[in-house]
């Protein structure tokens, strides 16, 4: 087995009440001015003020950038960077789901390294550590609060840039399920399927290790048991907490084993049409699993067993097929759209989408490597 590296934030706070603990632990850190990166909903709902008040109690001032939209853009990064500089912020707090986390990562990275966001597209392109970042999570899915992945939309090229860089790994991650109770069903479903995709892609990645395998399988098990409950009753705290742990486990898996064609393709859909990332993943997942099954059927069956399917006595091919069907059934049961047509994607755009997907960093570790025609066919199979 080749050598491997395991990336994770220095400190990871989990469970009810972990938000207050994490911010109290900043006492004595020397930080004076925080930039809180969030979105308008988090600000209007009072969660940004809650965090700002907790910071103030520790003697830390804060400025707020709440202009992050789903699929954060280069423009958003520049806007946040200006506020950071104007307020002499010495560290960054991201508050929300994947979009605020990714935007904050890019702000923190460019703040210390200079240049433009696009300079860091690819793997480990930065020279210096980013500004310290605390990522406070309010969704259970992206795991961006604890990864070295940062996805920013280039509005000019209409593509999502994948920045995979150890220097954007947050210093502290916070997963307090009390902050996740307010997630609507649609967001719970989309982010939960994103987490399941992380588990599947990490487990079948060419860079998988025994550590990432263990994380991926446990994540799949917990998601299968708790996602629908969390969707049906958002106030079910055991389900919310289980999903918080599950998405974190899936994050540990893909942060170190990387991903595959589902994400490489979903990034293009999100960047080109401004579609929700988790929904794109959910629609594409069964199609890419079917494509990969010719080389990793046994691994797909393993995930199915972890999800609680009675398939241990089946052959690898049959077990993989049953697992893929279970994924389809779960997605349908929580209201995920059936195909790309329902998302508004267009078949005539597929050649361009496929070309960009093959250049995405996430494509490198897919277990089955395809050419332009095969990836086009994969996209078309999802219509």
Swiss-Prot record:
Pfam families: ADH_Fe_C, Fe-ADH. Its EC number is 1.1.1.1. It comes from the Bacteria. PROSITE patterns: ADH_IRON_1, ADH_IRON_2. Coiled coil: none annotated. One of its GO terms (molecular function) is ethanol dehydrogenase (NAD+) activity. Its cofactor is Fe cation. In Z.mobilis there are two isozymes of alcohol dehydrogenase. Belongs to the iron-containing alcohol dehydrogenase family. Iron-dependent alcohol dehydrogenase involved in the formation of ethanol from pyruvate. Homodimer. This is Alcohol dehydrogenase 2. It comes from Zymomonas mobilis subsp. mobilis (strain ATCC 31821 / ZM4 / CP4).
